[in-house]
Swiss-Prot record:
Pathway membership, UniProt: Amine and polyamine metabolism; carnitine metabolism
Pfam families: AMP-binding (PF00501), AMP-binding_C (PF13193)
Keywords per UniProt: Ligase
InterPro entries: AMP-bd_C, AMP-bd_C_sf, AMP-binding_CS, AMP-dep_synth/lig_dom, ANL_N_sf, CaiC
Family: Belongs to the ATP-dependent AMP-binding enzyme family.
Gene source species: Escherichia coli O8 (strain IAI1)
SUPFAM superfamilies tied to this protein: Acetyl-CoA synthetase-like
PANTHER family associated with the record: ACYL-COA SYNTHETASE, MEDIUM-CHAIN ACYL-COA LIGASE ACSF2, MITOCHONDRIAL
GO BP terms in the entry: carnitine metabolic process; fatty acid metabolic process
Alphabetized PROSITE patterns for the sequence: AMP_BINDING
Recorded catalytic activity of this chain's protein: 4-(trimethylamino)butanoate + ATP + CoA = 4-(trimethylamino)butanoyl-CoA + AMP + diphosphate; crotonobetaine + ATP + CoA = crotonobetainyl-CoA + AMP + diphosphate; (R)-carnitine + ATP + CoA = (R)-carnitinyl-CoA + AMP + diphosphate
Enzyme Commission code(s) on record: 6.2.1.48
Protein name: Crotonobetaine/carnitine--CoA ligase
GO molecular function list: carnitine-CoA ligase activity; crotonobetaine-CoA ligase activity; medium-chain fatty acid-CoA ligase activity
């Protein structure tokens, strides 16, 4: 089923500007409180100016341009400006350091970088020490270093006309983006995303949360992440709604921002929910217009109920990953919800549970969650220059192996168990890290928790828990292990405990387990 009809991203923005004109399209709030607003007409003009800027710097169709930026208007300008001229965006996680950033530059073949002054010294070092194709850097800040090969993005953009000067032929099959996975367990892989992928994501995610043009979708998720791009931004723009992009998440500021912009939709990850819950209760906790809170794994039922009761919201579950582009399993609009189910397969997708021999399993049996879509349309096209890795997860007929374990009930509701790589083998038993984390998270003194397996010469693996306790609290080993023994089977009780001030996380809030093993 083709719901795009040949409409690539350049056509999308020209149409949006014509249809919605002076309606507010984008609001960006910086960490310093600076707010920038753009109508659909103004945003399309900024996108055109940015496209013209790239053209004057020699960027042509098929060229790759890296973005190393925090949430800001320039990210949106570059994303769609590149798409308008057929070039390819390569967003880089703004938290990455020199080695990881250099690796992505090398493997993406990016020839130009847009970044800010705070990251410039790192890229100056990369240019001097690493073999990349990078030939020019644009800085979004006003002040510039006196170096060759560095330009002011804003000054160059503002010199450009508001109409597009270079419009090569485009197809919805053209690559729009190479988005490198978070790499929590290994080197990141470049997920190839087409114009069709992004257009479909917009329509699909708008359907998922029943978006209308009078909605306001607020997100604090990083713009270089698939959730911000495909679940939030593309959904809001495709529906003609208003998209609010906050530079960085603050638990203290979040509800004030929701109220200030009269947001009707937002998205949360477990880390956000837990930090919001430890804020002092306020009479304004329920003073908002939120209709849905898009939610991504994983949360205990006790935490979910407490959050919904305190803030007067409901969670709309959505399950996906970079390779699926959108939440391909989730709560459907108007459908019943069945916690802790992650929902049912969305339109244009099939989902089933398979065993280790790639055979479908009946309802109730645990296996790998597999998704069927159309590569380059409803799921990613491939891993960039990595056919071996592509073949490992993507079958020729469109079945994608997620690497997640779960099961399905008789009514088609799916249940997430854990990442396969997060299952601990302990004396012949399979133990789910997520299951243990959900139990331990209910301890009133614990703010954050992760469980990992460590080598054990006798029982294959031992279980180690890393916890962060609430501010002002203390937790003894005796108290911790007693709680575990009272709430889980004996073979699941952790053998080791380490109390930390924080846990290592990537840009989407996922804990980087490899840093703890």
């Amino acid at each position: 089923m083709d719901i795009i009809g040949g409409q690539h991203l350049r056509q999308m923005w020209d149409d949006l500007a014509d249809v919605y004109g002076h309606k507010t399209a984008l609001i960006c709030e910086s960490s310093g409180g600076v707010v920038n607003r753009y109508s659909y007409l103004e945003l399309n003009q900024e996108i055109n100016r940015t496209a013209n800027l790239f053209y004057t710097l020699g960027i042509r169709k098929g060229d790759k341009v890296a973005l190393h930026l925090d949430n800001c208007p320039e990210f949106i300008f570059c994303w769609f400006g590149l798409a308008k001229i057929g070039a390819i965006m390569v967003p880089i996680n703004a938290r990455l350091l020199r080695e990881e950033s250099a690796w992505i530059l090398q493997n993406s073949q990016a020839c130009l970088l847009v970044t800010s002054a705070q990251f410039y010294p790192m890229y100056q070092q990369i240019q001097q020490e690493d073999a990349t194709q990078l030939r020019h850097i644009c800085l979004t800040d006003v002040a510039l270093p006196a170096d060759d090969g560095v330009s002011s993005f804003t000054q160059l953009k503002n010199q450009q006309p508001a109409t597009l000067c270079y419009a090569p032929p485009l197809s919805t099959d053209d690559t729009a983006e190479i988005l490198f996975t978070s790499g929590t367990t290994s080197r990141p892989k470049g997920v190839v995303i087409t114009h069709y992928n992004l257009r479909f994501a917009g329509y699909y995610s708008a359907w998922q949360c029943a978006l209308r043009d009078d909605d306001v979708y607020l997100t604090v998720m990083p713009a270089f992440h698939i959730d911000c791009q495909c679940t939030a931004a593309m959904a809001a723009f495709s529906a003609g709604a208003t998209f609010v992009l906050v530079e960085k998440y603050s638990a203290r500021a979040f509800w004030g921002q929701v109220q200030k912009y009269r947001a009707t939709i937002t998205e949360c990850i477990p880390m956000m929910i837990r930090t919001l819950m430890v804020q002092p209760p306020s009479a304004n906790d329920r003073q908002h217009r939120l209709r849905e809170v898009m939610f991504y794994l994983n949360l205990s039922e006790q935490e979910k109920d407490a959050f919904c009761e305190r803030f007067g919201v409901r969670l709309l579950t959505s399950y996906g990953m970079t390779e699926t582009i959108v939440g391909i399993i989730g709560d459907r609009p108007g459908d019943k919800r069945r916690w802790p189910s992650i929902g049912r397969a969305g339109f244009c997708y099939e989902a089933e549970i398979r065993d280790d021999h790639n055979r479908p399993l009946p309802a109730g049996e645990i296996g790998e969650i597999c998704i069927k879509g159309v590569p380059g349309k409803t799921i990613f096209k491939e891993y960039f220059l990595n056919p071996k890795a592509t073949a490992k997860v993507l079958e020729a007929d469109g079945w994608l192996h997620t690497g997640d374990t779960g099961y399905c009930d008789e009514e088609g509701f799916f249940y997430f168990v854990d990442r396969r790589c997060n299952m601990i083998k302990r004396g012949g038993e399979n133990v789910s890290c997520v299951e243990l984390e959900n139990i331990i998270a209910t301890h009133p003194k614990i703010q954050d928790i992760v469980v990992v397996g460590i080598k054990d010469s006798i029982r294959d693996e031992a279980i180690k828990a890393f916890v962060v306790v609430n501010e002002g609290e203390t937790l003894s080993e005796e108290e911790f292990f007693r709680f575990c023994e009272q709430n889980m089977a004996k073979f699941k009780v952790p053998s080791y405990l380490e109390i930390r001030k924080d846990l290592p996380r990537n840009c989407s809030g996922k804990i980087i387990r490899k840093n703890l093993k």
